[in-house]
Amino acid sequence: MTVIQRWTSEHRALLLLLGVSALMLLLGLGSRELWGPETRWANIALQMLQSGDYLDPYLKGSAYYDKPLPSYWLITATAGVLGDLNHWSLRLPSVIAAWLSVWLVYLIGKQLFSQTTGLIAGWMLISTFYFVFWGRVATADILTVCGLLAAVWWYWRGPDDTRFSRYCVFFLLLAVSSLLKGLIGFVLPGLILLPHVLSEQRWKRHVNVRLCAALAIALAVYLIPFALSHLYGAASYGQSGLGLVLRENVVRFFQPFDNLGPIYTYLLYLPAYTLPWAPVWIIALWVALRNWRHIEPNARWLVWGLALLFVFFTASGSRRSYYVLPLVPFAQLLGAWWVALRLQQRKKVVGRGWKVAFGLSCGLLLLVLGVFYPWSNGGGGVMQFGQDVKARASAQAPWDDWRMVMIEVDNKLPLYVQNDNQPFYFVSEDQDYPRQGDSAALMAWLDKTSGHHFDPKRTLIFAQHRSGDPLPLG
């Protein structure tokens, strides 16, 4: 095979992987109703777009600086490009991050071992149920995975390179990753790369002024959104972004206040989150440990790095199933190393059996996540309710003429009844609003508490009503 033929074959294989990955992440993406944590990102992004305040995140009208701002900014920016905040603009940042993660796993596998290893790792990752599932969900979790992989890939491009530019890019990747979910964007790359940095006293080469200068620049970049919130945000906001960073990352680690999973949580969920390929990486781990002195150094680093990440997450007092997501690509990479090693020992290319297995797994996931799941969650419910409200209200006046009042509503609702009028007015359940009497008393209360006039003929009031309860203002 000539160099040109080999280059063409390699790139054709990569394009197939990336093309299938895009299909699996995009098919049916806009059909499924909001789910679970997506509602928080949808509500906060919607209120930013409605109010024009991108420095003070609010959830249903209340201050909610639970995550750094850039994860919301990605959604609002996508909404600006697509022209609307909807399922597509909400989930597209996660989809792009998941797609890039597949590419990055391929690149890391190719750098560490071989192109065959990279391709197998990529196919394993994109045919992993929970990776694809979370890649189609609007949260910051897959964004963090992508940031971790980007930092690891950049490091392995030149682990002994001490140029200032190399340090700058590396630490900026860490800063940006930390701005998407939290300080684990700094911690996880440092942990997984630590064994390699310590080996052969490599760390001595990297203790220099250039590294310190690059780290200072990255820290300055990291602080920019918090500084903007402090300097230009609403004076009455009442929450500190940096204070909540410490609470959500440091306090939660040592003194957890929720998500109190048992210490064996990740012994259960790491295999579950790597299905259907969990047996492969478990066998690979066993093979690596049995032949520790004889396997290549990069394989030993991978085992050490995976172990450190596992210990870190287990040591945290706050544990949830999906916290294990950053380990998934590296577990699959370990499995791919073993498969490629077996193929090399037998002097075979990726056989028909593996291709069929990847194809069946991808096809099944495509049917479940791209067709069945969106279909089963795409009709009725809050989505249909929003369409019905729009139809009935638009029969009386243009939809954009209506103002919305939300009284302790379902988190899903605001996205489905948005318009181009003034921002929604949220009323919490503990506020002393009129619950009995007529609507005139409620309208007067709204005018008084909001400082704005609500036209009764152009105001829609949403409140949760449970079956059997008396009707509000009945």
Predicted regions located by residue number:
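Transmembrane-helix motifs of polytopic, lipid-linked glycan transferases
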Residues: 92-112
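Transmembrane-helix signature of polytopic, membrane-embedded enzymes
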Residues: 11-15, 105-127
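Extracytosolic helix-loop segments that constitute the early lumenal/periplasmic catalytic or substrate-binding loops
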Residues: 22-24, 41-66, 70-73, 77
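Specific aromatic-rich, kink-prone transmembrane helix
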Residues: 104, 143-160, 331-334
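Transmembrane-lumen/periplasm boundary regions of multi-pass, lipid-linked membrane glycan transferases
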Residues: 43-46, 158, 173, 180, ...
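Membrane-interface transmembrane helices that cradle and orient dolichyl/undecaprenyl
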Residues: 110-111, 116, 151-167, 177, ...
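Short acidic/glycine- and proline-prone juxtamembrane loop motifs at membrane-interface regions
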Residues: 87-90, 130-143
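Short periplasmic/luminal acceptor-recognition loop of GT-C membrane glycosyltransferases, typified by
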Residues: 22, 374-441, 445-448, 453-474
